[in-house]
Amino acid sequence: MESLNILISNDDGVFAEGIRALAKSALKKGHKVTVVCPDQERSATGHGLTLQSPLRVERADELFDKGIKAWGCSGTPADCVKLALSELLDKKPDLVLSGINHGPNLGTDIFCSGTVAAAMEGTLENVPSMAISVASFKWKNFEFAGEIAMNIAEQAIKDSWPKSLLLNLNIPPCERNKIKELSWTRLSIRKYKNQFSKREDPRGDDYYWLAGEAVLDLKSKGDGPKNWPSDVSQIQENKISLTPVEPDLFWRGSIDVLPKINTSFINAS
């Protein structure tokens, strides 16, 4: 296919293995690659933006393969893509990729994900965008994951990729010969136990670490076409999960089941 202008970001920061592997995979495919990502770890920042302090950027080409332009940014993942699209790039990219994340981004966890937020910024600007994650914090075969991501992205670009859809890709932590297939999936609804670990400091004051463990992955009510399986279930079966996500969070159920609101209080004296 023709060479694409690709913007790559992440939430693990400019020194992370995953983003370097993804940028290298895109470059090997003959694409023009620009990286704009946080200058430090920014995981679980969601779609936060920096409003109370200036954003600073510094060139980081030396961290990537020759031919890749790179910046480290002091802001969040969403800041990085927003700044790149508005100020740092000469022209609008053909594709935005975010990742490869060091760990899964599954189900309703995506609302906390800086990886997904970076890709969502591209979607909001009508640029085809994909978030990419390896579903393990320990598995390090990012080269293979980058190859998978680029093959999927190129096929999606050549076919019909609605600009209003973000694609959320999760890759199981196993070798090539153990992966069974790719499945279109829906988001599961994740529930956690022991979300906070309470501790006491030397002065006797309590403090907390967020440290929940996922115990339930509930089936969402909107199953999607043909009763799609959940992203979590497919990863558990060593299948690649690809979930289309819309930025439009509007509820599409019946108005009849919504609460009845009496508005007489508006004009009450």
Curated annotation (Swiss-Prot):
GO cellular component: cytoplasm
Subcellular location: Cytoplasm
Functional note: Nucleotidase that shows phosphatase activity on nucleoside 5'-monophosphates.
Alphabetical list of SUPFAM superfamilies matching this protein: SurE-like
Keywords noted in UniProt: Cytoplasm, Hydrolase, Metal-binding, Nucleotide-binding
EC number: 3.1.3.5
Superkingdom of the source species: Bacteria
Cofactor(s), by name: a divalent metal cation
The reaction(s) this protein catalyses: a ribonucleoside 5'-phosphate + H2O = a ribonucleoside + phosphate
Similarity comment: family membership: Belongs to the SurE nucleotidase family.
Keyword Transferase appears in the UniProt entry: no
Cofactor note: Binds 1 divalent metal cation per subunit.
MF (Gene Ontology): 3'-nucleotidase activity; 5'-nucleotidase activity; exopolyphosphatase activity; metal ion binding; nucleotide binding
InterPro entries: SurE (IPR030048), SurE-like_Pase/nucleotidase (IPR002828), SurE-like_sf (IPR036523)
Protein name: 5'-nucleotidase SurE
Chain sites annotated for binding a divalent metal cation: D11, D12, S43, N101
Organism encoding this protein: Prochlorococcus marinus subsp. pastoris (strain CCMP1986 / NIES-2087 / MED4)
